[in-house]
């Protein structure tokens, strides 16, 4: 097991990348941008222990849904929720990203390079399905997207 400040790759493989928390400075910038508001619902792919969800739901008052495939890390997010001041606005789901059907309320989506391009393609198909079910303005936020992500996103959006 490789450990680096906050990083956990115990269950990482070629498809699902190691857990690494987003720096608070990045979350502060996103939270202060005005792009996420109280009426929005944020979906955090690869939520890990819930940092993005707790911080942005507190800062912006939005509802946040974090999905995580790793049951051990998911359990830590649920444990963290017990002491969070924004717990009533945060939900977690343990599921593989490509199998998750987006709720029609989701209109903000956050990625910190959580998985392979193969999985991203399937996730983007799910996002499009949700959009066609209920057309709405949606914003996707990518923190440190890989070159593969960038090349794909330039052709699919």
Positions of the model-derived regions?
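S-adenosyl-L-methionine
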Residues: 3-37
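Conserved class I S-adenosyl-L-methionine
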Residues: 39-46
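Glycine-rich SAM-binding Motif I of class I
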Residues: 50-54
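Conserved SAM-binding motif I beta-strand of class I
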Residues: 63-68
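Conserved SAM-binding loop
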Residues: 77-78
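Conserved SAM-binding strand-loop segment of SAM-dependent methyltransferases
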Residues: 87-95
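A short SAM/SAH-binding and catalytic strip from SAM-dependent methyltransferases
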Residues: 108-119
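C-terminal substrate-binding/active-site "lid" region of AdoMet-derived donor-dependent transferases
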Residues: 118-157
